[in-house]
Amino acid sequence: MQLISILSLLSSLMCSLTVLGSSASSYVKFPVQKLADIINICTQDVSTVFKRNEVLNTTVINGIGVYVVKMEIGTPPQTLYLQLDTGSSDMIVNNADIAYCKSMSDGSDYASTDNYELTATFNGLPSTTISSEAYNTLCSYWGTFDASNSSTFENNATFFNNTYGDGTYYAGTYGTDVVSFENITLNDFTFGVSNDTIGNPSGILGISLPIAEFTDGIEYALALNRTPFIYDNFPMELKNQGKINKIAYSLFLNGPDAHFGSILFGAVDKSKYTGQLYTLPMLQAFNTLGSNPGMIITAQSVAILDSESGNKTVSDIQFPVMLDSGTTFSYLPTEIAEAIGKSFDGEYSSDDQGYIFDCSKVNDTLLSVDFGGFNISANISNFVTSAKDRCVLNVKQSESTYMLGDAFLVDAYVVYDLENYEISIAQASFNNQEEDIEVISDTVPGATPAPGYFSTWVYKPGSPIGTGDFINVSWTSYSEFSQYKSLLATAAQSDDASSFSSSGGSSESTTKKQNAGYKYRSSFSFSLLSFISYFLL
């Protein structure tokens, strides 16, 4: 297969990004479609593929960590395809004149490149690795934004910049414009236009908490004793402009072999999970800003479930973890990653950045995480890639940033409540039952506090982001927790751990840990490997 044919295949992908459906005033639905299926339906009548209903149906593509949504920006509208990311908060688009994309627009930098190789996933799905130079040419496929061609764009001259863990970089200024998808329109929507990009030919639609927005640097602004520029991002504007009732969304990736998943803004689909939907509080991540937490929860322990040996706990270390659909791999504390690797008699390979082991050991093994009285289990094969007779376990070691990516989330149903600062989780159901959607008006319908809701790691105010002291607080009632939350803003102004004490018998102990305060992005060489793999089914 020639490299150019792969890029042509990516071009054919875009023909299927047709937006169908209608809107409702209470919730918005984004079906998640996998890339292999898009190739198959490209020549079909789309009306036979998508079910039209009373909610917004926007095609979103799942490429193992890459979710793509079609957006129209400006007047007249310019079409872009943005990566949907639950781990960041800004909508960022690349400027049409950006040097990073413009220098490769003629394809001369990749036409003679054949730096790619075929590999395979554990399930036998073929995949392809392409050089980053070739991937950069995809700017034209994702689309760029020309602000000078939009009569409604206004630049507010507020600077932003951000560097991800793999070196991916954006820098530019914020502005406002009209954004639409199907018959949903957001007016005066704030987003960033990147004038300097490294390593990312696409834009991003971040849907995390606004506290994680790039802006001109939160810590920098506070150091200068000025209020940081924090704006209402995409989920917030959906509520502000009457599209949803609650700033919350549920994520369902569906099984590895399924055709569709979904993201529901402002609602929960009870048919997409089995068992109880349990709720956990988000952890305090940005201490210098008072009581605002980050989209991080507590993992109590990790176990391996094997049909032969049963339940085997590999670690009972508590750690803060982000459930991040924008990350393919999982990044766990080094001692936990080592314990998981050794449970398969694996040997760590620095070249593969993972544990190498005999593929026969996978079988029906599950990776199970205890989140505080309930467990979510994911098939270990989700974390495994294979080459010849060896398997690589893609559970990465980390000293500071802990994340469970989409290899784990594919087996979970997750509801992110950005107003109540809570995350609800259940085991995903793949029974293809009829939708049972319920609007989120206050708390998440059907969810109940986890047994370990009040025994969770929280951050000590005043600790630097990235490292810091955590305080294990055991609460006995919601009223106590409410008292605790009201004290956070005051406690944030001092380094006094006693400010966390509450009446009613709560207890606390302090342990030095690393937090998950930074966003980490998988390298684009692997993202492309995953991205292409679905085309080749």
Swiss-Prot record:
Cellular compartment(s): Cell membrane
Glycosylation sites: N57, N149, N156, N161, N183, N195, N311, N363, N375, N379, N472
Gene3D superfamilies tied to this protein: Acid Proteases
Active site, UniProt feature: D85, D324
Alphabetical list of CDD domains matching this protein: SAP_like
Topology relative to the membrane: Lipid-anchor; GPI-anchor
Biological process per Gene Ontology, one example term: proteolysis
A GO term for molecular function: aspartic-type endopeptidase activity
GO cellular component: extracellular region; fungal-type cell wall; plasma membrane; side of membrane
Family note: Belongs to the peptidase A1 family.
Name of the protein described by the UniProt record: Aspartic proteinase yapsin-6
Lineage: Eukaryota, Fungi, Dikarya, Ascomycota, Saccharomycotina
